[in-house]
Structures are given as structure tokens and as C-alpha cells.
Amino acid sequence: MKFRPLHDRVVVRRVEEESKTAGGIIIPDSAQEKPSQGEVVAVGPGARGDDGKLVALDVKVGDRVIFGKWSGTEVKIDGEELLIMKESDIMGVLEGAASKKKAAA
């Protein structure tokens, strides 16, 4: 990807959630909500604090994150649908999600 976010911006790729319920019912595409989980694909250098010093971001490339339903701006970069959002729009990082993904590969 040839995109570098500025300041405290984060680029996130949505991660599709299960299209089947625990009971085995398949949810059609028209009834599914947009996923609120994603994988961080790029991060900015950070925001400037009150003292003018750069404050690095807590998230890093590869982190699996949860964000609000209406968070971010949808963009298309290199033909891929991505979200650009501020780090403050991210609610949290799913610990161990990235390592499980690598172990499965």
C-alpha cells in the first residue's frame, strides 16, 4: 500500500465477521451489519502533545482492533476498501488475535 497516514490517523481493514449464528442460521448479506472489527494496516507518527513533543500511538500495524459502528472515513486505496480513523475512535485492541492468525497461517 502506498499511503502514509498523518498525525494520529490509523488505516484499518475491516475483518468480516461470521455470517452464521451460533445456532447455525446463515445471515444473508442484506441483513448483516458492517463489521466493527478490523486489522490495522498503517499508522501515523502520532499527535503532538501540549508541550509540542510527538506522542506515539498505542496501536501498531497488525493489531486487531474494535471500533464504533460509525467510526472512520471509508476510502478506496489500491482497489481495497479501507477506513481511516483517529486513534481515539478505536475502542480497544484484541490481545492475541494477531498471534492466533499468524499461527494458523
UniProtKB/Swiss-Prot annotation:
Source taxon at top rank: Bacteria
Chief site of localization: cytoplasm
GO cellular component, one term: cytoplasm
Alphabetical list of InterPro entries matching this protein: Chaperonin_GroES, Chaperonin_GroES_sf, Chaprnonin_Cpn10_CS, GroES-like_sf
Keywords: Chaperone, Cytoplasm
UniProt subunit comment: Heptamer of 7 subunits arranged in a ring. Interacts with the chaperonin GroEL.
Function: Together with the chaperonin GroEL, plays an essential role in assisting protein folding. The GroEL-GroES system forms a nano-cage that allows encapsulation of the non-native substrate proteins and provides a physical environment optimized to promote and accelerate protein folding. GroES binds to the apical surface of the GroEL ring, thereby capping the opening of the GroEL channel.
Entry-linked NCBIfam families: PRK00364.1-2, PRK00364.1-5, PRK00364.2-2, PRK00364.2-4, PRK00364.2-5
Protein name: Co-chaperonin GroES
Organism the protein comes from: Parvibaculum lavamentivorans (strain DS-1 / DSM 13023 / NCIMB 13966)
